Amino acid sequence: IDHDGNGNAGVPGMNGKQREKKIVRLLMLCALILFGAVWWASYGVQRAETSYVMEQRQAAELLTRCFSAVRGYKEELHIPMSQEDYHQTGMIGPYYTGITTTLGAIEAKRTTAWPDMGALCVRLLYEAGVRPGDRVAAGFSGSFPAMNLAVMAACQSMKVEVIPISSVGASTYGATDPELTFPEMLHRLVQDGVLTTDSAAVTLGGDNDTGDGMLPEQKMEILERLEQAGLVIFQEPKFLNNLEQRQEIYERQGPIQCFVSVGGNVTSMGVGERGIALGQGVLDPRSAMPVTDQSGLVERYLGRGIPVVHLLNIKQLTAEYGLPYDPVQWPD
């Protein structure tokens, strides 16, 4: 480095104008780099996150068709629409019937009966790492029929293979109509070509997953209808044996990439409060607790490194994703 006539440090062979031009070019390059970083942080990431928007729209539209079809089934069977079903979705059942298993919040049931839940399920599956062509296992109780169908619509829109095991028992305001249980809803939707995948197996749900506590006469009538429909029914009261049978059904065709749990069936949640403590939404396998004899499928799959989409605690789930909870009117 030498010095110019004014005592300033300079670069050999470079006059003042040349230095100014070089500085300007460097500043322009820095500005371009900064602009690119800002663009990627805002538009680029946003675009990457919403690259599945087409599947979200398809899932919402498909879920709307499901709701419409179920309303038609209820009309055929002379099942009145619930007064609590403010939006007339057909997804809200009576408070208590012979197949009601536990208490449930009507606000949560109404919140899930919104077509955009199909779009939310697409997002959750993508966040869990699921992609087209993957295989997903799903455990459905009758407590959240709308959310069950949202998962089915999301998987169908994403071209994901879904293996559902559905249960009859439902908490209050769920699929509690004894004449139209959730497994029957799904079966009819497949028969009518609205959905493409039926239950891989059906259980009665409730206590011991065998319908203990249900009205015996209604339980027998439902079993007869399910058998006549050709659905595979299994009744295994022993907890660990039940879990083994479910995993065998889920993984019969090969490994799964994700497990989806909807509602509070003991086979998914586990014995006691263990499943609730895990939270809701996408569960990372790194959050897994040690598996015990009381662990349900949620914990067991997490323990094997398989992500789980846990659809429970709807109020907290909607808050986390900026969605309304039990609004009087749904946003456009």
Stretch-by-stretch model annotation:
Residues 25-42:
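Hydrophobic membrane-insertion alpha-helices, especially the h-region
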Residues 179-259:
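A substrate-binding/cap region within the structured catalytic cores of diverse enzymes
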Residues 116, 126-128, 134-181:
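Membrane-embedded segments
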Residues 44-58:
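Ser/Thr/Pro/Gly-rich low-complexity linker/stalk segments immediately outside membranes or between
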Residues 57-114:
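N-terminal, Lys/Arg-enriched amphipathic/low-complexity engagement segments
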Residues 147-154, 271-279:
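Short Gly/Thr/Asp-enriched flexible loops that form oxyanion-binding sites at enzyme active sites
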Residues 265, 272-332:
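C-terminal functional extensions of proteins
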Residues 2-19:
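N-terminal Lys/Arg-rich, disordered targeting/topogenic segments
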